[in-house]
Design a protein with these regions (language model features):
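Class I S-adenosyl-L-methionine-dependent methyltransferase catalytic core
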Residues: 1-180
């Protein structure tokens, strides 16, 4: 299914980067029946790809109304596709990712969290978002086995893992650095 990109300001993950991310996630076996949170969802491509590879639930968080509307349209089309299985769910939350990470609650932790902010998103803000995800107590969005996939510009300062978390890998794909 081809995804549409809202005009200005949305930088979709390149096919090469997306394939590399999902190849690694597949090798770790974390996508089967996964609950996926896609922060700064943009086109929704990462979340939709996760669903196509076995995830059962997607929450896509996007603050830009045109982008959120396009994701909703894509998810509606996907739900009418024969590949959609009973038990799968997907929804869009129109909110700022930072506010969602700091305040939202979940019935169970997410297995995979994609964080793909604009390249101009400051490293301090990125570190705060990670700290907010790590510091939650009730309605936690993360659990012990949660895999975080963070995309940044290779020119950005490296993010700092919150206490108790580790950045275990960094892979560069052109202008994009992906942290796990």
């Amino acid at each position: 299914m081809a995804l549409t990109t809202p005009k200005p300001g949305t930088r979709p993950t390149t096919d090469r980067t997306k394939e590399a991310i999902f190849s690694l996630l597949d090798s770790w076996g974390v996508l089967d029946d996964a609950r996926v949170l896609d922060l700064f969802a943009g086109t929704g491509a990462l979340g939709v790809e996760a669903l196509s590879r076995g995830a059962r639930e997607l929450v896509a968080v996007e603050s830009a109304a045109p982008a959120a509307a396009l994701i909703a349209k894509t998810l509606t089309a996907l739900k009418h596709n024969r590949s959609w299985e009973p038990g799968m769910s997907a929804r869009v939350v129109k909110a700022r990712a930072e506010k969602y990470a700091a305040a939202a609650s979940a019935v169970a932790p997410f297995d995979v969290i994609f964080i793909d902010p604009p390249y101009a998103f400051e490293t301090e803000a990125c570190n705060q978002l990670l700290a907010d995800l790590a510091g939650r107590e009730s309605g936690e969005l993360t659990g012990e086995g949660t895999v975080i996939v963070l995309e940044r510009s290779t020119r950005s300062d490296e993010p700092t893992a919150p206490e108790g978390w580790d950045i275990t890998d960094r892979r560069d794909y052109g202008e994009t650095a992906v942290y796990y």
